[in-house]
């Protein structure tokens, strides 16, 4: 879940009407407030044991989809297509990652609603609502956790709740915005962005003038330093200044240019739609049964959701949002690797190493003495500058090999021997 930044210039010549519109938009943004109790209610239900971890294709996913559909219906939103808020899709997944014969067909459900302002342009605000279920698809970071409920409060009941609350704000205010909003809740993300791929395939047919996509994935664990990663800022020249302009005073931003990352904005970027991706970072509960609702930073999530509300308003008032291909996406593909270091990477592109946000117990990094907060700079002789070069370096390592791994700790270089 992530992503760096280019500097930009923004030139705007505002007519009197334009100034009035901008002023009103800012006034509206300040008066409309996210309801923290709504966020909490949605997350506690979606991340409850009743939903059994919301695995795509499961009964828990169906319960979640019905809940989300009911919320959209209460708001009086329109259908995206067909006769219900649900968009069905299918894909194959291997139940045993080492055996092709275990492949099975999974039927997933996106939940999509439209605020139709009869506008020429459309913005998508989305998040995935699926999670790992009982670890049937082997995506957990906890060994031997099959059968344990992975509730996925941060990943991604948090983003889902934010989309629901934004749908409420935009549909219940007394303003007819300059754009239509599509509120999209995806399933199949944990198996490879399957649901967002389905919507991205049809979006330009149903809404040809879709100009932007905002994705929220894991926005519920704002840390004590108030660090928020915003990816995709290189996908349009207007974005670096815009995300800074509306930044809440308490938030520290890490900006990343790339339109590609391990979350649903990628599907839209690949259709030449500019994107933003918001992410509060990985943590030791990531993809574990312990990612529970009581661990969410609800005031922090409220701040982030208000931030997205302001960004979505501002983007709707832009006359044009040009699309830019980002350098990393043009030159990088996701490599295949045979080993894991057992860390949680920081996806901010710092160019001088990759920060380690978490270290998983009893995995190679932890066993070697690498700590959370270290900055990874080398695996063997392969230099690590950010998450993409980290993946390249990891792809060169074979299981059973030992390599020196270099990190910076409190400004001092340290080398550890890691057995992969």
Question: Which residues does each PLM region occupy?
Answer:
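Alpha-helical metal-binding/catalytic segments enriched in His/Glu/Asp
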Residues: 113, 125-126, 130-131, 135-192, ...
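Conserved PDZ fold ligand-binding element
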Residues: 367-387
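N-terminal capping segment at the start of a domain
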Residues: 33-63, 75-81, 95, 212, ...
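A non-catalytic alpha/beta surface segment that caps or lines the substrate-entry region
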Residues: 54-115
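PDZ-domain C-terminal substructure recognizer with occasional recognition of PDZ-binding tails
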Residues: 392-420
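His/Asp/Glu-rich mid-to-C-terminal helical/loop segments that flank catalytic regions of hydrolases
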Residues: 284-330
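Metal-dependent peptidase/peptidase-like ectodomains
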Residues: 118-120, 186-277, 297
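PDZ/PDZ-like groove recognition
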Residues: 328-372
């Amino acid at each position: 879940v992530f992503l760096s930044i280019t500097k930009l210039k923004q030139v705007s010549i505002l007519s009197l009407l334009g100034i009035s519109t901008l002023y009103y938009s800012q006034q509206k943004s300040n008066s409309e407030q996210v309801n923290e109790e709504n966020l909490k209610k949605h997350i506690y239900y979606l991340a409850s044991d009743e939903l059994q971890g919301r695995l795509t294709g499961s009964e828990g996913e169906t319960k979640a989809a019905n809940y989300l559909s009911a919320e959209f219906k209460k708001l009086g939103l329109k259908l995206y297509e067909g006769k219900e808020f649900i968009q069905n899709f299918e894909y194959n997944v291997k139940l045993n990652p080492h055996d092709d014969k275990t492949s099975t067909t999974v039927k997933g459900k996106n939940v999509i609603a439209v605020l139709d302002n009869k506008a020429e342009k459309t913005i998508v605000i989305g998040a995935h609502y699926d999670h790992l279920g009982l670890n049937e698809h082997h995506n957990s970071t906890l060994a031997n956790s099959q059968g344990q409920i992975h509730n996925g409060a941060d990943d991604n009941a948090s983003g889902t709740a934010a989309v629901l609350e934004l749908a409420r704000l935009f549909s219940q205010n007394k303003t007819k915005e300059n754009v239509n909003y599509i509120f999209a809740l995806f399933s199949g993300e944990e198996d490879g962005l399957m649901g967002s791929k389905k919507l991205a395939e049809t979006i330009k047919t149903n809404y040809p003038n879709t100009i932007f996509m905002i994705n929220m994935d894991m926005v519920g664990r704002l840390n004590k330093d108030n660090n928020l990663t915003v990816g995709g800022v290189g996908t349009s020249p207007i974005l670096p200044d815009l995300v800074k302009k509306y930044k809440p005073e308490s938030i520290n931003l890490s900006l990343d240019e790339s339109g590609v990352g391990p979350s649903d904005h990628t599907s839209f970027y690949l259709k030449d739609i500019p994107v933003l991706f918001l992410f509060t970072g990985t943590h030791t509960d990531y993809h574990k049964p312990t990612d529970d609702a009581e661990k969410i930073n609800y005031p922090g999530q409220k701040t982030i959701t208000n931030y997205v509300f302001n960004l979505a308003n501002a983007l709707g008032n832009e006359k044009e949002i040009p699309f830019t291909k980002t350098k990393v996406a043009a030159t990088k593909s996701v490599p295949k690797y045979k080993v894991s270091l057992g860390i949680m990477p920081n996806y901010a592109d710092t160019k001088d190493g990759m920060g380690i946000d978490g270290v998983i117990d009893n995995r190679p990094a932890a066993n070697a003495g690498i700590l959370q907060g270290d900055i990874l700079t080398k695996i063997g002789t392969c230099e690590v500058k950010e998450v993409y070069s980290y993946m390249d370096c990891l792809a060169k390592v074979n299981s059973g090999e030992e390599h020196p791994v270099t990190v910076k700790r409190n400004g001092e270089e340290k080398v550890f021997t890691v057995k992969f």
